[in-house]
Amino acid sequence: RHCKMFNDFYGLTGRPFQLTPDPTFYFESLTHRKALSYLSYGLAQGEGFVVITGEVGAGKSTLVAHLMATIDPARLTAAQIVTSKLDGEELVHVVAQAFGLIVDGHDKASALGAIEAFLHDEARAGRRCLLVVDECQNLDLAALEELRMLSNFQLGSHPLLQCLLLGQPEFRRTLAHHPGLEQLRQRVIASHHLDAMEPSEVGAYVEHRLALVGWQHAMHPGAHLS
């Protein structure tokens, strides 16, 4: 109710700073522009892992939502999962569900078979497959190893699945230093850490989001943003 009164008073048509990622509000700061270039390069390779890390609120999910909005579904089939504390077997079933697959049986082998058959069908139809995995810091080593194994699926010499991994800074550290992740590290073809926005960009960012919900007033040049 208070939010509606606030919006009515200022003539806003929506919530400019809602927490849910919305590609409409994407603002290309310097660090996001760099991340998008790494993403574009990585996805063009069509294989391996692309890694984007950043603090909570850095804009990882909004960046990916912006990217997803530009994807041609006739050429790329994308699925996204937000991970909790999953082990390897649970992860495989979650991936199958994300691609809309019905798995006969509850064992890992059945889920893997369904995923591989699906990836082969998509490849024959001329579509690449992308799996976006959010909150990767929640995954244990067994689950990360399952992701690496999924990325091994091929049709001839053609990789069938590419993975985009999103995580908080602790995932970046784990990926860089854990001895059990050496093979996964070798499969990373592009990575970027989202830094904080430059102080000089904050005003433009606020105005950008306000303008998208109907704000028609100029911000005072001396306005203090904190």
Regions from the PLM with identified roles:
Residues 116-120, 124-165, 170-173:
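Conserved Walker B catalytic segment
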